[in-house]
Swiss-Prot record:
Matches recorded under PROSITE patterns: CHAPERONINS_CPN60 (PS00296)
Cellular-component GO terms for this entry: cytoplasm
NCBIfam families cross-referenced by the UniProt entry: GroEL, PRK00013.1, PRK12849.1, PRK12850.1, PRK12851.1
Protein known as: Chaperonin GroEL
Family annotation (Pfam families): Cpn60_TCP1 (PF00118)
EC number(s) recorded for this UniProt protein: 5.6.1.7
UniProt organism field: Rickettsia africae (strain ESF-5)
Keywords, ordered alphabetically: ATP-binding, Chaperone, Cytoplasm, Isomerase, Nucleotide-binding
Residue segments, region Disordered: 527-547
Length: 547
């Protein structure tokens, strides 16, 4: 076991804060309409250029273990904000740094860290209520486009394309993003389906940055029962390997030896495979699997019809242009199903909806109908170079997530204005002691930082702008950093999803609270040994299968 380095008290927190500063300084430059790009070296290929806070944060790893512990904690605030709301990562980073730094100063001055935390939590809960009160629901295509435009750093085309995609498949519809083969940026609606089942093992992931498994032009095996042994599947697996195409297995479950064998072969490169549980339960599961079979022109392998896995040929497998699997969802895009068969299935489900008397059954049938007939909107992002396409694709994905958040919880005035004005009622909060009051004041000061940073990235004095806005009673009055003018933010279309603002603050406070209440830090002591040579990859030919 490696020996440990143990640090206590303010020394530990100070070193952690140094790591937090390093990460926050790299991330904060991306905030606002005049935020700058960050260039990140890749282990292979050309460098990545991004204005996405969480991408910058994820790329940072510090050599010093204690500083790195602080940086990783701050990174978790950005990552959580991205996971929950899809945006607000830079805001979360800026807030967390401000809260942690001010909190640490007070702990060093003798304030009780637990009471500081209680005061901070009181203040944050009050701000969250204020955000909910001031949020405005969005309905029109124009409002949806505004959110998409702001979340993509002012790219109007991205906002308009997202609004168009939502109009095509509905606000709750499935929208995916992929790279185009040309310069254009288009919206295409294709046959497709999404269901709420994710990969059965993280070892199936092909894109570790986004933690998703992406299968291009895969075969799809649909099996009604549980898979616990792969022996009956050997002939079909060998045929798939020979075809050099990926395989998606959808079954009631894949467990034990079968799952372990698939994972081993996926890691060794012999078989590009992923496995997910079938959606639904009981008879509904079977019906949904039949829907997928029709959508992908495959067969549901069911023992009721006397079908056995060992007799299945490649002709019984479904196919699709692409399948994307996350931890929670599977999206099948452009299944190879026959259009007439899909239409017949849709009519069959419609007649079942008309006949059923159960509201629950009707709701579930309508869900199936929406999945089968709604299709998938694909945002195809093009550009002149690979670097440009990847950078724009990242912005489209962020903007799409933020737009979904806006549809869910409404929008508030953007540009850091909502957080700034939400700090004003905090002075009236009742507390038990002066330490809790100090916790509230930490939050009041930190809420000014996102707006200050946006203004400073635009080349103006943040403190002066904050002072001017606090004198104004209109909560929507703010500073348009793009045009360098004071405006009504809502009327000017400068809006943020309420969910993004709320999540950024809650995640930042959670991380800052952890830092100020940390008294002891234990990390591995730096090793004097030279780092081992990296293992060389290599997997030739079709061999190496381990069934």
């Amino acid at each position: 076991m490696a020996t440990k380095l143990i640090k206590h008290g303010s020394k530990a927190r100070e070193q952690m804060l140094e790591g937090i500063d390093i990460l926050a300084d790299a991330v904060k430059v991306t905030l606002g309409p005049k935020g700058r790009n960050v260039l990140i070296e890749q282990s292979f290929g050309s460098p990545k250029i991004t204005k996405d806070g969480v991408t910058v944060a994820k790329s940072i790893e510090l050599k010093d273990k204690i500083r790195n512990a602080g940086a990783q904690l701050l990174k978790s605030a950005a990552t959580k904000a991205a996971e929950v709301a899809g945006d607000g990562t830079t805001t979360a980073t800026v807030l967390a740094r401000a809260l942690a730094r001010e909190g640490n100063k007070l702990v060093a001055a003798g304030y009780n860290p637990m009471d500081l935390k209680r005061g901070m939590d009181l203040a944050v809960n009050a701000v969250v209520e204020e955000i909910k009160k001031s949020s405005k629901k969005i309905n029109s295509q124009e409002e949806i486009a505004q959110v998409g435009t702001i979340s993509s750093n002012g790219d109007k085309e991205i906002g308009e394309k997202i609004a168009k995609a939502m109009e095509e498949v509905g606000k709750e519809g499935v929208i995916t993003v992929e790279e185009a083969k040309n310069f254009s940026f288009d919206v295409e609606v294709v046959k497709g389906m999404m269901f709420d089942r994710g990969y059965l093992s993280p070892y199936f992931v092909t894109n570790s940055e986004k933690m998703v498994a992406e299968l291009e032009n895969p075969f799809i095996l649909l099996f009604e029962k549980k898979l616990s042994n792969l022996q009956p599947m050997l002939p079909i697996l060998e045929a798939v390997v020979q075809s050099q195409r990926p395989l998606l297995i959808i079954a009631e479950d894949v467990e034990g030896e079968a799952l372990a064998t698939l994972v081993v072969n996926r890691l060794r490169g012999g078989l590009k495979v992923a496995a997910v549980k079938a959606p639904g339960f009981g008879d509904r599961r079977k019906a949904m699997m039949e829907d997928i079979a029709i959508l992908t022109k495959g067969e549901l392998i069911t023992e009721d019809l006397g079908m056995k896995l060992e007799n299945v040929s490649i002709k019984s497998l479904g196919t699709a242009k692409r399948v994307t699997i996350s931890k929670e969802n599977t999206v099948i895009v452009d299944g190879n199903g026959d259009k007439k068969n899909i239409e017949d299935r849709v009519l069959q489900i419609k007649s079942q909806i008309a006949e059923t008397t159960s509201d629950y059954d009707k709701e579930k049938l309508q869900e199936r109908l929406a999945k089968l007939s709604g299709g998938v909107a694909v945002l195809k992002v093009g550009g002149a170079t690979e670097v440009e396409v990847k950078e724009r694709k990242d912005r489209v994905e962020d903007a799409l997530a933020a737009t979904r958040a806006a549809v869910e919880e409404g929008v508030v005035a953007g540009g850091g204005v909502t957080l700034l004005h939400a700090s004003q009622p905090l002075t009236k909060l009742k507390v038990e002691n002066k330490d809790q009051q100090a916790g509230i004041e930490i939050v009041i000061e930190a809420l000014k930082d996102p707006l200050k940073q946006i203004v400073e990235n635009a080349g103006e004095n943040g403190g002066v702008v904050v002072g001017k806005l606090l004198e104004h009673k209109d909560k929507n009055y703010g500073f348009n950093a793009q045009d360098m003018q004071y405006v009504d933010m809502i009327k000017a279309g400068i809006i943020d999803p309420a969910k993004v603002v709320r999540t950024a603050l809650q995640d930042a406070t959670s991380v800052a609270s952890l830092i100020i209440t940390t008294e002891t830090l234990i990390v591995d002591e730096p090793s004097d040994k030279a780092e081992p040579m990296p293992m060389r990859g290599g997997m030739g030919g079709m061999g190496g299968m381990d069934f």
